[in-house]
């Protein structure tokens, strides 16, 4: 899959959808995330994942039809059904892993809270997918313009927890994104 194809699919599946403000076309969010991933040196695959990162959350039925699947009932099933499809190649696994809305562990979220769940997602992400998720968080913070304080606070706590507990090697891009999320410094 190339970036143009990913963008086309995202535009198709988000057509007619709007952000929470009811005015901004939803496609502006994946566009912003893909732009940040590109700006921070993400691979072509990572940019594709950025364009597609919300397709299951926002249009599961359209995604199912587009992919020619009878049903999409779980992340694991989706990955199994899509194995070997050259047109989606390596994008699929990363797309499934980055989605915190697809098949979240509701019991874990209830027991530990959303912040811990997000921190765990960050800790287990590959370097490429960490870049996409951090760009997604930063784009959401920027787009909210202070109107979603609880989400911003949750993101900051999760990123702070991740940066204190994480032992993975962070790239300069990761470090800059973490600083931007924590400090709200323009990036």
Model-flagged regions — what are they?
Residues 1-187:
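Active-site helical microenvironments for divalent-metal-assisted chemistry
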